[in-house]
Swiss-Prot record:
Biochemical pathway: Energy metabolism; oxidative phosphorylation
GO CC term (a single one): respiratory chain complex IV
Broad class of the protein's primary localization: mitochondrion
Protein name: Cytochrome c oxidase subunit 5B, mitochondrial
InterPro entries in the record: Cyt_c_oxidase_su5b, Cyt_c_oxidase_su5b_sf
Family affiliation: Belongs to the cytochrome c oxidase subunit 5B family.
Mode of membrane association: Peripheral membrane protein
Record's subcellular location: Mitochondrion inner membrane
GO molecular function: cytochrome-c oxidase activity; metal ion binding
Subunit structure: Component of the cytochrome c oxidase (complex IV, CIV), a multisubunit enzyme composed of 14 subunits. The complex is composed of a catalytic core of 3 subunits MT-CO1, MT-CO2 and MT-CO3, encoded in the mitochondrial DNA, and 11 supernumerary subunits COX4I1 (or COX4I2), COX5A, COX5B, COX6A1 (or COX6A2), COX6B1 (or COX6B2), COX6C, COX7A2 (or COX7A1), COX7B, COX7C, COX8A and NDUFA4, which are encoded in the nuclear genome.
Length: 129
């Protein structure tokens, strides 16, 4: 048992010595090109990068962000984007409600939630692709 511990300690010491540079100082490795930890913008690739760049411009091409709530009245309905003529919508009605009221929303005039009376309106949206 003791020999196994000594062998392990010797291996760790050898690795530490190999990690040191020729001057005896520990070699430094940089994570980012400028040194330090890279930012999210430097590290993001693919779809994540596209979303971050669009968010800087104030856009949400993939509907990642929560929709902006309106007052829900007939004059100022909640706008629901859709690529078709109808879409199923879920209304929570009240903050502490534990169930969701689902109903179909069709293109045209604003429609009301059957339970709470909040108004929703379907608006056309193009795909980001």
């Amino acid at each position: 048992m003791a020999s196994r511990l000594l062998r392990g300690a010797g291996t760790l010491a050898a690795q530490a010595l190999r990690a040191r540079g020729p001057s005896g100082a520990a070699a430094m490795r940089s994570m980012a090109s400028g040194g330090g930890v890279p930012t999210d913008e430097e590290q993001a690739t693919g779809l994540e990068r596209e979303i971050m760049l669009a968010a800087k411009k104030g856009l949400d091409p993939y509907n990642v962000l929560a929709p902006k709530g309106a007052s829900g009245t007939r004059e100022d309905p909640n706008l629901v984007p859709s690529i078709s003529n109808k879409r199923i919508v879920g209304c929570i009605c009240e903050e502490d409600n534990t169930s969701v009221v689902w109903f179909w929303l069709h293109k045209g005039e604003a429609q009301r939630c059957p339970r709470c009376g909040a108004h929703y309106k379907l608006v056309p949206q193009q795909l980001a692709h």
